[in-house]
């Protein structure tokens, strides 16, 4: 819980930039932090709880739910760096150093791609 709270503080500004309503930026920031630290699967489990309006803590807008769905869709998390180094490195062991060098950049690129898709979906919804 402390990790998701810290992630919320870090990522809530980015959530505002991609078009999330101010009432939902904190929860959306938590979702992005969970996705990056754990995996998109855990993020989707959390999103399923946040979709339920009968819960005390929930997302207030349907647009936020749709943006979250696109934002969580992707393989950009810290575990994926290891998976890519192990998987691709097994095919070409000489390139493991390059893979580890570019792993974090790939994480940032993948996250930005997911956020761009979420932003476009939010723009289309209006």
At which residue positions do the language-model features occur?
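Single conserved hydrophobic/aromatic residue that forms the stacking wall/gate
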Residues: 1-7, 11
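C-terminal transmembrane helix pair
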Residues: 35-126
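Short coil/turn linker and secondary-structure boundary residues
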Residues: 2, 20-21, 94
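Hydrophobic alpha-helical transmembrane segments of multi-pass integral membrane proteins
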Residues: 12-49
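Transmembrane helix-loop boundary segments of multi-pass membrane transporters
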Residues: 5, 26-30, 68, 101
């Amino acid at each position: 819980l402390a990790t998701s709270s810290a992630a919320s503080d870090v990522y809530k500004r980015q959530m505002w930039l991609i078009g999330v309503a101010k009432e939902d930026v904190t929860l959306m920031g938590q979702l992005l932090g969970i996705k990056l630290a754990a995996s998109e699967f855990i993020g989707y489990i959390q999103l399923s709880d946040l979709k339920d309006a009968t819960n005390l803590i929930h997302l207030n807008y349907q647009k936020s739910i749709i943006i979250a769905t696109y934002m969580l869709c992707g393989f950009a998390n810290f575990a994926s760096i290891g998976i890519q180094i192990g998987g691709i490195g097994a095919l070409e062991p000489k390139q493991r150093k390059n893979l580890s060098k570019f792993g974090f950049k790939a994480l940032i690129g993948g996250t930005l791609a997911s956020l761009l898709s979420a932003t476009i979906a939010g723009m289309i919804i209006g």
